[in-house]
């Protein structure tokens, strides 16, 4: 799969899917197994994100190595750990009923990742959406407030306005979103 990706990416994706289907969650922890998941997540078309659910289920959520939890730094840039990428891809691919079910009984790996990568905005925003799907509005608000404290982004304030029941807070959050929004993106 690793060699084939340079010659024929589509064939390599198909072979990776066959590989995941064949091992079907069996315990396999090695660098090649992790490299296959990394390749699949990187090359999976956005239009086919739901396929990530099936692939990772076959790959095996219990197959992450200790190294897969570590972030990489290259050329003064930080890159997310494989676990982060995987969970973001999975949560992005989930539909509302799946997010609700996931929130009711979060797997241990998800809870560990939420604690380890609390600074990952994408992961935390997706987890907030899972809380909303499970009708845990107060928990979702608290998650969003934590994100806003760390990063003053206009879209976070907009999301706060969308989910808060307090009309005064809603108006304040919308005003803050407008103030923080880049001028070229403001459509008035």
Residue ranges and their predicted role:
Residues 1-4, 14-17, 21-97, 118-129, ...:
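Amphipathic alpha-helical repeat scaffolds of TPR domains
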Residues 7-23, 48-68, 100-114, 137-149, ...:
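Alpha-helical repeat scaffolds
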């Amino acid at each position: 799969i690793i060699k084939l990706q340079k010659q024929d990416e589509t064939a390599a994706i198909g072979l990776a899917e066959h590989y995941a289907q064949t091992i079907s969650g069996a315990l396999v922890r090695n660098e090649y197994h992790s490299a296959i998941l990394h390749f699949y997540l990187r090359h999976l078309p956005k239009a086919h994100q739901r396929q990530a659910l099936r692939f990772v289920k076959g790959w095996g959520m219990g197959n992450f190595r200790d190294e897969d939890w570590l972030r990489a730094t290259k050329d003064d840039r930080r890159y997310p750990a494989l676990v982060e990428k995987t969970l973001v891809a999975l949560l992005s691919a989930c539909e509302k009923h799946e997010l609700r079910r996931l929130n009711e009984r979060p797997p241990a790996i998800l809870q560990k990742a939420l604690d380890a990568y609390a600074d990952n905005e994408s992961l935390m925003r997706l987890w907030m959406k899972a809380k909303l799907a499970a009708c845990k509005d107060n928990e979702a608000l608290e998650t969003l407030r934590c994100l806003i404290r760390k990063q003053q982004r206009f879209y976070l304030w907009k999301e706060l306005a969308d989910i808060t029941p307090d009309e005064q807070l809603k108006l304040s959050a919308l005003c803050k979103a407008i103030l923080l929004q880049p001028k070229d993106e403001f459509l008035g």
